[in-house]
């Protein structure tokens, strides 16, 4: 068994007993990256020297007995999360050479624990997309089938964990950007409650929807990482003050009597038959574990996708106004005057999808259309929140498929924005309502992974993890991606 194939909790056992060093673990992952990265293109930056230095520091920490649950564990960070002294590009020409002078709060927390950063992962430019094909630098491939997408926008992070390039990764989720790629790559991905994890240092896309979360190899690892990254941060005005629970205490196999809601809206038109069957089998597994399955309805969820694309694009058009070539980022070389410089800089720096969203958002916010689009979308947002609140009166968690399909072919939806946007049809409502959600692998359809999404009430991550863990232990999903030469 190679070190790179182990989970966080397995590596911690070995590190604690001094059976391996953090340096050995790090070298194992760096070798793995050299082996599989040319095939999957998951990373935009590899920080080998920095990682080896941090590994030596972690070993010193362990020697002194100052280690914690994540000391000596290697991570990959999505490239829209700021890392001091390490390029943070958002996979955009606009920020191709941008090196932040500070760390995001989540990165600071991980470094304090002695975590080792191996590199930064590829994403859809500025996190806008569902396939990681919108990156200005490269197209990440799915380790299960190199002709297919890994999902997006955090496709690089998901592919990296599926291919064992790190023990865990961080991503961001605005409308499904952690859960959907986790589903397509057969790993665990969690979007915490909005405000639970600090967004300070996350390059903003849609500030009322964005949330940072982990990709891991199993549910136990997810709980371990969550313990570290949550917490109030005065630098983020939307960060919430709540008591910090120990999420590992929720990892129990007992879910007897737990009420699980199944919304009919999550099994509607557009879902692949194989995905539907796999998720229905998963519901049966949970029923056999003693959970009570309750049919529920979330009527306004059918309007979630259009509402999301209006709200997210409106916020993006405002957030991305800062990229004008004046203070940092790309600046045009040839221009006639200040206005022309803005126009040329932004035309050169932004890709097609980012321009599309900025135009959509600016249109929705314009004086003649504000009431018809943006204001209406905010009303729909409230209706969706109310629907979830009503549903949670009848059940403790809600489950369904994470994505309506398995991973699709690279290029298949590139010229059809609507088909691409539909990839997030089951995930956007969770962001709109600010709820926590997790995707866990539940089986295969045509040899490709299917994700089960578990949604909870605000701050009920513990219950979600309980259900996810119980299911994982009963289901024992053990398939591994073979397209990269049989990872793990």
UniProtKB/Swiss-Prot annotation:
The entry's keywords: ATP-binding, Ligase, Nucleotide-binding, Protein biosynthesis
Enzymatic class: ligase
Family matches, as Pfam families: Amidase
Gene3D superfamilies found in the cross-reference section: Amidase signature (AS) domain
Active site: 78 (charge relay system), 153 (charge relay system), 177 (acyl-ester intermediate)
GO molecular function: ATP binding; glutaminyl-tRNA synthase (glutamine-hydrolyzing) activity
EC number: 6.3.5.7
Coiled-coil ranges per UniProt: none
Keyword Cell wall biogenesis/degradation: no
Family: Belongs to the amidase family. GatA subfamily.
Subunit details: Heterotrimer of A, B and C subunits.
Protein name as it appears in the record: Glutamyl-tRNA(Gln) amidotransferase subunit A
Provenance organism: Thermoanaerobacter sp. (strain X514)
Gene: gatA
